[in-house]
């Protein structure tokens, strides 16, 4: 019997020993190999804190600060570390309701129970100061410092852009970003996101049982410093930009001003505009909804995204192409026979007079010679050939494609080609008589205002342009984009552009010109008026450059739905921009007062109430 019980006792000992060995092995595995449990254990005593870099600043061309940063704080939470929380006291301390607390905690749990996420974002320095002395009582919560964008002057919202929280697409496509990070959403903030954002750092802090940080882990040897973003030095003239927005304050339209010799954008505004600080901080979402629902579309960048018929300003490019192709000469004249509608004026005896008087029949016949060059007996094939040649030269002027300016969302406009009309009418079913409206900048031709300002640059430079751009350089090494310094030639002779410049000078200063309201004493302004047809009231259009020789500025102005042509509204507004830039001040105070205060599109509502859809 004793042997029997001894045998059983041995078996029991073996079983207990085996269980003990398995327990030790499992414990060792948990300690040494199981990453999840190791990470959980580490988080009980260590806190990984992301160090957010300061975003790069922005300056105007004269060194004036446009965008800077202000310190704010995010309240972070690690859900599984929240223990013994007096929820009522916590909610009173941070100023939220119990329901809000539960919703935020549920969101944090969904993201990760073991990782930090934002519980409350963009806390002011004042609120942080009030919470600092009680925060240690809330285990699992801590403060993370970051910066908030501040726009020094309430200008250039469409250029500077705004910053917002990353979305799911950002998280999926770029591993740099984590939930709660911020990214440039529009304007230069978006175009230069990688340069502006900097590089995040990391700090590991030891935390005691009372949720107090007691010092850096391993004396900070595992920490990495955040690297601040690079500063942008823009081409904008802040004073000119502010003035342009002042002049267009009660209007719809846009202004683009460029330095012809460099392609640097001096001012770019879209009206109505808004204060970029509206899209900063915790009120951003509410303000965005309000701006987005405004019937006047203040978020829409008309300077880059509106596609208008150019109207008569397009005649300058038409004349240059026709002269280069040899289908007309500088002395070619056409009778103003009203074959296409025109205002009352004498017949143009040459190209210079045609530009000055903006004669529609003149450019009708000029365009016909470009399209029907007699290369083929078949009129349809001949028109296809002529349109192909015309289209090629128009693209050399920067029309019909997205100009590579350093802002997102640029539209390309439309310069119709043979494929366009073949699709619309069918092959060999169209000819010049189908498309003649293109001759005066109507029909199927569409341009964006940036392209029209660039046309003014081309004439100012007598045949070439540099890509319009908004950043001169960035970073401590003054990094420049080499593409912005490439000269783009039209391939058209300088002597023809001299004719265009003289004709545009006569538009403003000559007898019978259409833009006498753009005349500035002692400044030679060269301009071209236009009236862009529209379903409602037509748009008032004007392009110009000044001075005539050694130009300093080229400008395009669109005033939407204005009751009058280009010479009535857009031309005098352009003259104010030119005078402000060249002189530094506007001396024609009566002109300034009138065109700043006047509203040419009074019948248009600026806002509307969004109606709720009816239930069916």
Q: What are the roles of these predicted feature ranges?
A:
Residues 67, 109, 208-213, 218-221, ...:
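Beta-lactam-recognizing serine transpeptidase/beta-lactamase-like catalytic domain environment
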């Amino acid at each position: 019997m004793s042997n029997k019980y001894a045998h059983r006792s041995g078996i029991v000992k073996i079983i207990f020993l085996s269980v003990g060995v398995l327990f030790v092995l499992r414990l060792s595995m948990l300690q040494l190999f199981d990453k999840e449990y190791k990470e959980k254990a580490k988080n009980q005593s260590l806190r990984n804190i992301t160090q957010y870099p300061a975003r790069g600043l922005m300056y105007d061309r004269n060194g004036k600060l446009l965008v800077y940063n202000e310190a704010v704080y995010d309240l972070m939470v690690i859900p599984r570390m929240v223990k013994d929380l007096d929820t009522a006291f916590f909610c009173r301390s941070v100023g939220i309701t119990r329901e809000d607390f539960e919703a935020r905690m549920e969101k944090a749990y969904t993201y990760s129970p073991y990782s930090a996420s934002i519980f409350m974002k963009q806390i002011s320095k004042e609120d942080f100061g009030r919470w600092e002395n009680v925060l240690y009582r809330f285990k699992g919560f801590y403060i993370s410092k970051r910066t908030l964008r501040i726009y020094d002057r309430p200008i250039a919202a469409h250029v500077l852009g705004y910053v917002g929280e990353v979305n799911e697409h950002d998280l999926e496509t770029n591993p740099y970003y984590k939930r709660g990070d911020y990214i440039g959403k529009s304007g230069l903030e978006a175009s230069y996101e990688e340069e502006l954002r900097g590089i995040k750092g990391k700090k590991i802090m030891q935390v005691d049982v009372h949720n107090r940080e007691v010092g850096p882990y391993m004396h900070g040897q595992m920490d990495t410093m955040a690297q601040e973003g690079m500063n942008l030095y823009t081409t904008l003239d802040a004073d000119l930009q502010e003035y342009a927005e002042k002049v267009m304050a009660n209007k719809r339209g846009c202004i683009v001003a460029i330095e012809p010799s460099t392609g640097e954008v001096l001012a770019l505004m879209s009206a109505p505009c808004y204060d970029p600080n509206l899209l900063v901080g915790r009120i951003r979402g509410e303000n965005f909804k309000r701006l987005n629902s405004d019937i006047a579309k203040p978020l829409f960048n008309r300077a880059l995204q509106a596609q208008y018929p150019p109207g008569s300003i397009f005649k300058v490019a038409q004349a240059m192409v026709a002269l280069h192709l040899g289908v007309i000469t500088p002395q070619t004249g056409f009778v103003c026979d009203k074959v296409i509608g025109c205002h009352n004026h004498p017949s143009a005896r040459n190209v210079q007079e045609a530009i000055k008087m903006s004669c529609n029949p003149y450019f009708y016949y000029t365009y016909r010679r470009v399209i029907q060059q007699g290369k083929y007996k078949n009129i349809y094939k001949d028109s296809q050939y002529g349109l192909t040649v015309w289209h090629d030269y128009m693209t050399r002027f920067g029309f019909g494609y997205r100009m590579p300016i350093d802002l997102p969302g640029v539209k390309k406009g439309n310069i119709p080609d043979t494929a366009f009309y073949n699709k619309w009418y069918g092959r060999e079913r169209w000819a010049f008589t189908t498309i003649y409206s293109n001759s005066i900048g109507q029909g199927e031709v569409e341009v964006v205002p940036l392209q029209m300002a660039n046309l003014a640059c081309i004439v100012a430079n007598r045949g070439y342009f540099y890509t319009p751009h908004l950043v001169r350089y960035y970073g401590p090494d003054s990094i420049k984009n080499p593409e912005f310094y490439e000269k783009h030639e039209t391939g058209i002779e300088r002597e023809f552009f001299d004719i265009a410049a003289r004709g545009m000078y006569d538009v403003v200063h000559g007898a019978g010109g259409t833009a006498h309201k753009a005349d500035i004493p002692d400044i030679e302004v060269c301009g071209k008026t236009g009236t862009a047809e529209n379903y409602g009231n037509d748009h008032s259009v004007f392009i110009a450059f000044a001075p005539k020789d050694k130009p300093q500025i080229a400008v395009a102005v669109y005033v939407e739905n204005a009751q009058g042509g280009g010479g009535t509204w857009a031309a005098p507004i352009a003259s104010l921009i030119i005078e402000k830039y060249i002189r530094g001040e506007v001396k024609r105070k009566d002109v300034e007062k009138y065109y700043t205060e006047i509203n040419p599109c009074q019948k248009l509502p600026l806002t509307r109430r969004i109606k709720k859809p009816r239930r069916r």
